UniProtKB/Swiss-Prot annotation:
EC number(s) reported in the record: 7.3.2.2
This protein's name: Phosphonates import ATP-binding protein PhnC
Protein's UniProt keywords contain Hydrolase: no
PROSITE patterns the record matches: ABC_TRANSPORTER_1 (PS00211), ABC_TRANSPORTER_2 (PS50893), PHNC (PS51249)
Record-level GO cellular component terms: plasma membrane
Pfam families linked: ABC_tran
Database matches in InterPro entries: AAA+_ATPase (IPR003593), ABC_transporter-like_ATP-bd (IPR003439), ABC_transporter-like_CS (IPR017871), ABC_transpr_PhnC (IPR012693), MetN_ABC_transporter-like (IPR050086), P-loop_NTPase (IPR027417)
Localization, UniProt: Cell inner membrane
Length: 272
């Protein structure tokens, strides 16, 4: 079980990115975090993987506290799928998946035959689970399509048998059909391997289709936590409104910054 217990995060500039978040996620649960940019989604993810410390409250995984004092627990239990893929282009698909065990191994990349047979078998199984055919195993990762590469990243994330997998906008650059295919692969891998998935998305329809649980955030606070079937039209409408309000606010702030910069340049030229 992954537990956020009254978690807060205040940055040095005084910005409170996360406000009193309490969420309990069960083993194997596929949880989607929804909310506009700046809602606190990334901060929550970064606290789980140890990059950011809670200002107060705790994040607990099966009784152990996740923080910088307990990095071994994080390294052993938490895996990450990034929006920006970090595959090694010149390595084969199989070898890229095998690198998923390297944080707990005593060697860097080597020939595939240097990995134990059981690890190679595990990689074969994971690639099959995410829908990559055997013919792709020895191809270079750089030769694959974007959706295929994301499947490789998913398989790699499960290689070390993590308890928690964090997925940061895993379908941001994919078309709708491929996005659904990749999310289906991610959910299937999570169910098969018994891992809890915490996934950030911007698309409400994907969350409603694939999530076991949706947690929606606004300005660091949870305003919805429940099953997709509990997210009625009023809540969905409010979420769209929040997204629109946030975009307008960001655009205004950007415009003001440009105007301030231009004003400063004109003052400098006037003095000169």
């Amino acid at each position: 079980m992954l537990v956020f217990d009254k978690v807060n995060r205040v940055y040095p500039d005084g910005t409170q990115a996360v406000k009193n978040v309490s969420v309990h996620l069960e083993k194997g649960e596929f949880c989607v975090l929804l909310g506009p940019s700046g809602a606190g989604k990334s901060t929550l993810m970064n606290m789980v993987n140890g990059l950011v410390e809670p200002s107060s409250g705790e994040i607990i995984l099966d009784g152990g506290v996740l923080n910088k004092k307990n990095l071994q627990l994080i390294q052993r239990s938490v895996s990450m799928i990034h929006q920006q893929l970090y595959l090694i282009p010149r390595l084969s698909v199989l070898h890229n998946v095998l690198t998923g065990i390297l944080p707990t191994a005593n060697f860097w990349t080597s020939l595939v035959k240097s990995f134990p047979v059981k690890d190679q078998q595990r990689a074969f199984e994971l690639l099959s689970e995410v829908g990559l055919e055997e013919k792709h195993l020895m191809r270079r990762a750089s030769a694959l399509s974007g959706g295929q590469q994301q499947r490789v990243a998913i398989a790699r994330a499960f290689m070390a048998n993590p308890k928690v997998v964090l997925a940061d906008e895993p379908v941001a650059s994919l078309d709708p059909a491929m996005s659904r295919s990749v999310l289906n692969s991610l959910k299937h891998a999570a169910q098969t391997n018994g891992a809890t998935v915490l996934c950030t998305l911007h698309q409400i329809d994907y969350a409603l289709e694939f999530a076991d649980r949706i947690v929606a955030l606004r300005e660091g606070e949870v305003f919805f936590d429940g099953h997709p079937s509990d997210m009625d039209e009023d809540i969905q409408k409010r979420l769209y409104e929040i997204e629109h309000e946030t975009k307008e606010k960001m655009q205004k702030n950007h415009q003001k910054a440009l105007e301030d910069s231009l004003s400063f340049e004109l003052k400098i030229k006037a003095v000169a």
